[in-house]
Design a protein with these regions (language model features):
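N-terminal Sec-pathway targeting helices
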Residues: 1-16
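An N-terminal hydrophobic leader/cap segment in hydrolases
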Residues: 15-56
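Membrane-embedded segments
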Residues: 63-135, 139
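Primarily recognizes the serine-hydrolase "nucleophile elbow" in alpha/beta-hydrolase
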Residues: 135-186
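Active-site nucleophile elbow and catalytic-triad environment of alpha/beta-hydrolase enzymes
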Residues: 188-202, 208
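Short beta-strand/loop motif that positions the catalytic acidic residue
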Residues: 205-207, 212-214, 218
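Conserved alpha/beta-hydrolase "acid-adjacent" motif
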Residues: 219-225
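C-terminal catalytic histidine-bearing segment of alpha/beta-hydrolase fold enzymes
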Residues: 227-270
Length: 270
């Protein structure tokens, strides 16, 4: 019996050590798990954005880099908040469509992503997001916010702190820590995760009309995140759920055809 007790104790201690090691690994490597910034910087000259320009925007003690195109007269400007991977320029086909339909845009890399130097953190991303909005506001056009995936967090935060015409959230999380808890249900992510992006709290202060777009086939951020976040919006406009669509499928699925009338409705409001 004594031997069995010792074996049981040893197994318990081993389980504790393994669990502690898993928690320690997550804590030490959490930003490497959360962000995928590596990738090429797309040259503006290699796109069809003939009237866009490269811009450098002061943000905190550094700066962020992006592209800007002014809207057609009387049209609004989309401030675009990218996801957690690679560089903003890889989505140039979206910006080309915005411009073709008369919309202006500002898109950029958060600090620590390919086009903008620095270290990645939630505080830095939120500071960059506000700096981009404030820079765009100085241009004088009405502003529309579009946040995709990770970008839904800073877009929601900015909408809670500034006045825009509309907030579009594409494949958003309820919060980043919600997604982490879904992926690692046996780890105390609420205690150890630094960059939690609590959109579920920020959205309470969002007065702009909100469109949430998501797909039922999204295995990166489950569609329930978008549905739950939309339910919390004080000024919900529309919820667009695409059957079978994955995390990166909504542009091809026609999100722009949903976004344009949403933006037009928002612009028509006083």
């Amino acid at each position: 019996m004594k031997l069995l007790g010792r074996v049981a104790l040893a197994l318990i201690l081993l389980a504790i050590l393994l669990y502690g090691g898993a928690v320690g690994y997550m804590y030490a490597n959490q930003r490497a798990l959360q962000y995928e910034p590596a990738g090429p910087v797309i040259a503006l000259a290699d796109t069809a954005l003939a009237n866009a320009e490269e811009v450098t925007i002061p943000a905190g003690e550094g700066s962020i880099h992006g592209w800007y195109a002014a809207p057609a007269p009387g049209m609004p400007l989309i401030v675009y908040y990218k996801g957690n991977a690679r560089s903003f320029g890889e989505e140039h086909e979206r910006y080309e469509r915005f411009v073709a339909d008369g919309y202006g845009f500002l898109a950029f890399d958060y600090r620590g992503f390919p086009a903008s130097p620095g270290a990645i953190s939630q505080d830095g991303i939120l500071e960059d997001a506000l700096a981009a909005f404030d820079w765009a506001a100085e241009r004088g056009a009405p502003l529309l916010l579009w946040g995709r995936s990770l970008g839904s967090g800073p877009a929601t935060y900015v909408a809670s702190q500034r006045e825009a015409k509309a907030l579009l959230l594409e494949t958003p999380f309820l919060s980043a820590v919600t997604v982490a808890a879904e992926r690692y249900p046996y780890l105390p992510v609420h205690w150890v995760m630094q960059d939690q992006f609590r959109s579920n709290e920020w959205i309470a202060a969002v007065t702009e009309p909100v469109l949430v777009a998501h797909g039922t086939g999204d295995v990166t951020i489950d569609v329930s995140n978008g549905e739950r976040l939309y339910a919390l919006a004080p000024n919900p406009d529309s919820l667009w759920i695409v059957p079978g669509a994955g995390h990166s499928d909504l542009w091809a699925a026609g999100i722009w055809a949903e976004a344009k009338p949403f933006f037009e409705r928002a612009m028509a409001r006083q």
